[in-house]
Amino acid sequence: MAYFQDRKTSSRSLPSYINHSTQNLVGPRKDETNLSEYMKLRLLQSPSQVIYNLENTVSLYRRCLNLRKRLMDISELAAFFDSIHREALNSSFKILEFKDIEFDDPVTEIWLFCRLGYPLCALFNCLPVKQKLEVNSSVSLENTNVCKASLYRFMLMCKNELGLTDAALFSISEIYKPSTAPLVRALQTIELLLKKYEVSNTTKSSSTPSPSTDDNVPTGTLNSLIASGRRVTAELYETELKYIQDLEYLSNYMVILQQKQILSQDTILSIFTNLNEILDFQRRFLVGLEMNLSLPVEEQRLGALFIALEEGFSVYQVFCTNFPNAQQLIIDNQNQLLKVANLLEPSYELPALLIKPIQRICKYPLLLNQLLKGTPSGYQYEEELKQGMACVVRVANQVNETRRIHENRNAIIELEQRVIDWKGYSLQYFGQLLVWDVVNVCKADIEREYHVYLFEKILLCCKEMSTLKRQARSISMNKKTKRLDSLQLKGRILTSNITTVVPNHHMGSYAIQIFWRGDPQHESFILKLRNEESHKLWMSVLNRLLWKNEHGSPKDIRSAASTPANPVYNRSSSQTSKGYNSSDYDLLRTHSLDENVNSPTSISSPSSKSSPFTKTTSKDTKSATTTDERPSDFIRLNSEESVGTSSLRTSQTTSTIVSNDSSSTASIPSQISRISQVNSLLNDYNYNRQSHITRVYSGTDDGSSVSIFEDTSSSTKQKIFDQPTTNDCDVMRPRQYSYSAGMKSDGSLLPSTKHTSLSSSSTSTSLSVRNTTNVKIRLRLHEVSLVLVVAHDITFDELLAKVEHKIKLCGILKQAVPFRVRLKYVDEDGDFITITSDEDVLMAFETCTFELMDPVHNKGMDTVSLHVVVYF
């Protein structure tokens, strides 16, 4: 009989957020006098006793089947069941309804026996009482008031003649409600009256058949299933009985807490939420299961049961979502719960019972999968069973998704409170939080633990400021609420810049490598996830996000990208950066959300809008707001162009690039992944994305350049003014306006040079006074932007020397070690070109953009952006 012993639930059936210390009840203690009532119920009975009690007390179907047989043995009541049976067939009221399937339904018939009222009056008249009740068998459920009047007289006489208390009776109003709880109480009343009848009638009492031996009542359903070799069905049935017993015990425990006022009503509701709804649903499910088991094997349709009740499984969503909160409330109120420790020990027995619904909803897919594997060939309802399997998988996924959304909402609230400096960003522009976790992140052979949050539009990496180590969560008497440490924003990458996501088994079984477009090449970092479930979740979410970014229509992208013109900043956004120090070495290069990449000129904004991602500058620089004509900075409008081949670019013109120098932090450049390494890793996994990574990105996505959108509806260029230029070492102030290159007749942009003249209107042209001897160079070193004014005929060696001197003078690099620099510019096709000679310098200067420096006298200077890579 080892099969009947309690078996531990497999950990595979539990979601990752469940505390595994509360999966199962602990074993029996040596001193049996200290056992709680629940443990006595489970441990101090033989296996055969447990199964017998489960089948004849927990099973609503078997109880009603036995009661119907005993009631029909009373001659005065037998005639009533014909009309009750007809009423059950014709009425819309049923305990469970299957389309096109008819079952013997003793539960509905006994429920009608109570609702009609007159059958109970007839049962009362069979007892040795002085006063009889009127029995009107012609009424139906349509005459509800007449039925209630009969029930009232029945209740009154039971109290007066039989001395029954309210605890032994049921509520008249509740018996007409759809809940099964009043029916369970009504069954107790009927059983009590039948017992009195059998005691008073000695002849019938001696011949009354036992519920366990009657030939017409299926005895030992579980034993029959095991004997026939249907062990999976037997496990489903046995565990369902035990599960409902646990739910009923929890429900009674909750009532005792209310009666004794151990906890407040709100706290009790917060712990148990909709436990009674789950209990009611599971009773109906068990009725449907036993209806099926009462049929021959070839006619049983378990798949139809799950299909019919798919919608009803939604009751689990609320309970499973609230479970972490319930766990914490149990911990916080353990001292009060110890007052009823004789019923349930609060530190381990109560949490172990409270987790049962979550375990059960995760167990159904496993059981049905085993049923499908053991289904004999030729079973006529096999396809229906597969559909039932699909239903229960959907239910489990929906429960998990609801729980995930709830956790994500809480995570966003917690994230907003914990981050000490948002650097001017606002959570409201990040989109929906898709997934988050605390994982180890590897880049450039450095591994650190980060809080990683993947939103629809950005990936954030945050680091805990506290040096305290996280302690494993456990349920104990002395456990206190965990203090939330502050988080520091360390890395941020636009999801539109992510190009490839692949597993990396060289770094671990559950490692994911994410490639993104950096400056000047593709870069990557590795997330070391903790288990297979997390690995599958992150891969699935990232792949869906990549597909959405690549296949989303421009209309959808623009719609998703639209953001309010005046953002509402976080409470911490006003805090300014303190500058770079040795502790600020970022594992991931931080990205400015208000500095995006080139965008196609075919998409334009008719009006100028303030960027929602303008960051607050440091205290040494004046705060300024970047004004552009972009619909949004988060969504890449030219995702195909940015990484496409030259053939794709032949039909598209590249926008002129100007820079936005707003920045709040500076970071030492990380080691850049080589393209050959990327291709090698992708080839290992047969990932067909080489066309996206074998060519370096045609624009910087790390916040070093932005696009100018021309208003094609007007030939008048919007004037753009820049802040006065100095040669000091301050980070450049954000520009407010800038002239852009000329426009072709088809609306595309022309590459601008120092000889390009700018028209102020479509009919008149005015030449600006330009400085033809000097060139202003904007040096891009990651998020730092420096300004250098040089002669137009400067040589390559002189330019390198001036750039190195500028970097040393500004003190950007704290390490006093020798270094070299490499300069690059962006050509007309958007490609990065390395400067290696004097000719390259002249070619770079040919891409200059004229910027108006003095709007009063219409004076300006040619400006070029050069990207700096530092080598140590």
UniProtKB/Swiss-Prot annotation:
It is found in: Nucleus; Cytoplasm. It comes from the Eukaryota. This is Rho guanine nucleotide exchange factor scd1. Residues 599-616, 645-667, 748-765 have a biased composition (Low complexity). PROSITE patterns: CH (PS50021), DH_1 (PS00741), DH_2 (PS50010), PB1 (PS51745), PH_DOMAIN (PS50003). GO terms for molecular function: guanyl-nucleotide exchange factor activity; lipid binding. Scd1, scd2, cdc42, and ras1, in its GTP-bound state, act cooperatively to form a protein complex. Interacts with moe1 and cdc42. Its main location: nucleus. Keywords: Cell cycle, Cell division, Cytoplasm, Guanine-nucleotide releasing factor, Nucleus, Phosphoprotein, Septation. GO terms for biological process: activation of bipolar cell growth; division septum assembly; establishment of cell polarity; establishment or maintenance of bipolar cell polarity; intracellular signal transduction; positive regulation of mating projection assembly; positive regulation of mitotic division septum assembly; regulation of conjugation with cellular fusion. Pfam families: CDC24, PB1, PH_10, RhoGEF. Residues 617-633 have a biased composition (Basic and acidic residues). Required for mating and morphogenesis. May contain a cryptic binding site for cdc42 that is enhanced by binding Ras. Interacts directly with scd2. Promotes the exchange of cdc42-bound GDP by GTP. Involved in septation and stimulates the elongation of conjugation tubes. Residues 426-547 form the PH domain. It comes from Schizosaccharomyces pombe (strain 972 / ATCC 24843) (Fission yeast). Residues 82-198 form the Calponin-homology (CH) domain.
